[in-house]
């Protein structure tokens, strides 16, 4: 699976225990996402476009409105891309 460098870095943070938090406006539209590392740092590479690409490919998911975490498919994409480099 073709995964960009930005997506790989975000997936790597999520695999280490990070999470993606979403921010919505008063109309319920998604305006901003923040990728937070397990140490509490914010990853600047995680833009709305990267988030939408990861979600569209089902590499991340949310359970009951919680933060977005990496899925098994995301872990496979992360492990598969590290073997080719």
Curated annotation (Swiss-Prot):
Pfam families: YjhX_toxin
Similarity-based family: Belongs to the UPF0386 family.
Protein known as: UPF0386 protein MXAN_1729
